[in-house]
Curated annotation (Swiss-Prot):
It comes from Phytoplasma sp. (strain STRAWB2). HAMAP family: Ribosomal_uL22_B. Keywords: Ribonucleoprotein, Ribosomal protein, RNA-binding, rRNA-binding. This is Large ribosomal subunit protein uL22. PANTHER family: CHLOROPLAST 50S RIBOSOMAL PROTEIN L22-RELATED, LARGE RIBOSOMAL SUBUNIT PROTEIN UL22M. Belongs to the universal ribosomal protein uL22 family. This protein binds specifically to 23S rRNA; its binding is stimulated by other ribosomal proteins, e.g. L4, L17, and L20. It is important during the early stages of 50S assembly. It makes multiple contacts with different domains of the 23S rRNA in the assembled 50S subunit and ribosome. Part of the 50S ribosomal subunit.
Amino acid sequence: METKNAKAIARKVSIAPRKARLVVDLIRGKNIAQAQAILTFTPKVAAPVILKLLNSAISNAVNNLKLNREQLYVKEVFVNEGLRLKRMFPRAKGSGDMIKKRTSHITLVITSSTNLQTSKEEEQSGSKN
């Protein structure tokens, strides 16, 4: 049986990937109720953006794939580096330093815990043969 995964992607988010990964690591593997609570009370700049992305993935799962909301959990979430905007910062004697304004691509995948149970049962039955 093929597992159904709901996916949401936020591209070109103006948060450095290093800072976004701190928040993403908190919710990986959690069920959606726990993840929403964690993101609501996390005092980081990336938390509201990731919460909005989580809510989008939940809507995709419930409306498009008809998955049960109570059984959803965060299967995988990762942050990739996006574009780097290069800006000049003026320094002494007419010189300048480069400032790299970093962006992120955040990907969040959620699935139902019943999908996890059925895939584990298939693996166990396949290994016995």
